[in-house]
Every structure is written in C-alpha cells, then in structure tokens.
A protein has these predicted regions:
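Conserved ABC transporter NBD signature motif
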Residues: 38-50
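ABC ATPase nucleotide-binding domains
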Residues: 77-212
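C-terminal boundary and immediately downstream tail of ABC-type ATPase nucleotide-binding domains
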Residues: 206-229, 257
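The short alpha-helix immediately C-terminal to the Walker A/P-loop
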Residues: 27-28, 186
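Catalytic "switch" loops of ABC-type ATPases
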Residues: 32, 62-63, 67-75, 176
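ABC ATPase nucleotide-binding domain helices that frame the ATP-binding cleft
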Residues: 23-26, 125
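ABC ATPase NBD coupling module
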Residues: 47-64, 88, 208
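Non-catalytic connector elements of ABC transporters
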Residues: 2-11, 15-17, 23-24, 31, ...
C-alpha cells in the first residue's frame, strides 16, 4: 500500500472500491496495523515514523475507531459499554456516562444489552463509548455498509447531527459516493492501495481527473480519446469528434467522461460531435428512466439517464436522433 495525503479539514472522506486499501489506511492511523515505512502525524503529534522508530500504541493515540459492526461488548449494558474505558473515580464516571447517554439520545436504554438495540441505537452507543475517551480523531470504517438504502440515509443524517459539535477530525471510508459527498469537506480517492486524487469534495466530483476517480464518483460513460489538437478529440468507441471552443485539451488528456444525466437530446439535424442514437434498451425506475445505447461493436453501452419529466417528452416525440455533449460537462481524464 502506498497512500500519502495531507489535509487541514475536519471532515475527510476516503473513497474507493472494495479491497483497495481504505480500511487498512484507517487501521494504520489507529495503530492496529503497523506500516513498513512512512509517517503518520495528526495535529502535530507523530503517531508513527519508521525512520525514527516511533510507534505509539493504539491506546495512546487518542484515536476513536468505529468498526463496521460497532464492536459492542454483548454481555455489557449500554451504560457499561460506554464507561468501559473510563479511568477516573466512580462518581466522575457515572456523571460522564449520564452526559453521553443524554447527548446521544440513549435515555431509557441504559440497562439494555446490544442484542436488544436497533442498528441506530447500537451506533449511537458505540459513538458514545468513543467520546468517553475524548479522542482527537474519529475513524469511521464503512459504518453503513450492511444497511439498506433508506436506513443508510437516515443514519448518515443522524451521525452528522451527533458529530456536529465535535471539534476533532473525522475520517470516514466508504465505497458509496453519496455518503462521501454528503459527509466530507475533502476526499481522498484510493485505487489498488494508491492515493490518486485528493481535494475538496465538490472539486473532485466536478473534475475527477482520472478514470478510476470518475467511475467512483458516478460517471457511467468513459472512453479513451485520440487528441487531434488543442481543441479537438476523436472518441473511437462512440464515433464522435468533439471540438471545444472554450476549453483547451492538454496533451495529458487520454480519455473523457460524460455523466449520464448531462446529455442533451437532439432531434433533426445532427453532427459528428453528437452520439447517434440507433439501437437501445431501457429500464424504468420510480423517478427516472435509464437508456443503454449501443455504440461501436465490442464497446460498452452508452448510458443516458432521464428524469420523469423528460421521459414524458420522449413518450410524445420518440427517441432523439442523437445526444449532444455540453462542453462544460465533459470530463478531461488523464488515464
């Protein structure tokens, strides 16, 4: 694994496919895994430095780790789980536990065991236990991966509310672009153990720069290009020649992408700069229709997603003759 990043933001997302090294990055920060080389520094405190032989033990790092399954002790009640790591006197411990139970909306659940709690209640208990340590950093390891879409959205909202007054750094890893976009100020994209793109979350989504980053941020249509000059590229897979009037195509551009919602239907006169619509398949969803348009033989289908109001126009006028690429929506990708 070779991951390097520096950030001054307080809400950081790490986005990557399964098995790319996201969780290993968190475990290295927490001290669960020991890297072979490199440095880990948080708020000026060196947690690990291979060259100087520094390796702080996990319990000395002031790092809270929220595991995917929350890792609550099954034979302990909510209040016992929260207070397990507290080292002060009994009176201070009871006061601290009561404050955390109230803050994380666990009132009335103090005597229950984890098996009697809902997923959201288990998550809040695990977060309260982390907060009892007063960590400088909280690490969230795919906290919603086992939940269905509705519960993920609801629990993400709850998590953001619970952490709204936490002044430390929170790092969340996920393969869900929606979770990362909603949660993060800054995002690191990881591919095969390498950090390939770091930046403000909106900037990375608008200009992912690399094919992998484009795919992970939701771009369905990506193809290699032949750069003809500083304004023109030819896309063999789509049989499209695009000329950019307001943008310059650098020599580093090896591919382009266009998001499935950004295409414009064209009826009548078409040009070489448009994707010809000949054969297609479609799938209906509650709020949109997805078209999969056949391109050149051996190439992946081209994706065009339309909202319900556009679907109504298509019902009336039929499929367009072509799809146009808005210049400002085309993603320039370096490979």
């Amino acid at each position: 694994m070779d991951v390097a990043f520096k950030s001054e933001k307080k809400r950081i997302g790490i986005l990557g496919a399964s098995g790319c090294g996201k969780s290993l990055t968190l475990k290295s920060i927490a001290g669960i895994e020991r890297p072979e080389k490199g440095r880990i520094v948080i708020d000026g405190v060196t947690l690990f430095d291979a060259g100087k032989k520094i390796f702080l033990k996990p319990q000395k790092r002031k790092v809270g780790y929220l595991f995917q399954n929350y890792a609550l002790f099954p034979n302990m009640t909510v209040e016992q789980n929260i207070g397990i790591g507290f080292t002060g006197n009994k009176e201070d411990k009871q006061k601290m536990v009561e404050q955390l139970i109230h803050h994380f909306q666990l009132d009335g659940l103090e005597k229950l065991y984890p098996s009697k709690l809902s997923g959201g209640q288990q998550q809040r208990t695990a977060l309260a236990r982390i907060m009892a340590y007063e960590p400088d950093v909280i690490l969230l390891d795919e906290p919603f991966s086992a939940l269905d879409a509705y519960l993920r959205e609801r629990m993400l909202t709850e998590l953001m509310e619970m952490l709204s007054d936490y002044e430390g750094t929170v790092i969340m890893v996920s393969h869900s672009r929606d979770e990362i976009y909603s949660f993060s100020e800054e995002v690191l994209v990881i591919e095969d153990g390498h950090g390939i793109r770091l930046g403000p979350v909106k900037e990375v989504f608008n200009a992912p720069r690399y094919k992998t980053a484009a795919r992970l941020t939701g771009c369905k249509n990506i193809a290699d290009v032949y750069r003809m000059d500083a304004q023109t590229v030819y896309v063999k897979d789509w049989d499209v020649q695009l000329t950019f009037k307001r943008r310059t195509v650098s020599e580093n551009v090896k591919a382009i992408g266009i998001r499935a919602h950004d295409l414009i239907p064209v009826y009548g006169t078409i040009s070489d700069a448009m994707l010809k619509v000949k054969e297609w398949k479609s799938v209906d969803y509650p709020f949109e229709r997805k078209y999969f348009i056949q391109c050149e033989p051996g190439c992946e289908d081209f994706c065009w997603f339309v909202q319900r109001e556009v679907s109504a126009i298509l019902e009336e006028k039929g499929m367009p003759d072509a799809l146009a690429f808005p210049e400002e929506k085309v993603l320039f990708l370096e490979g």
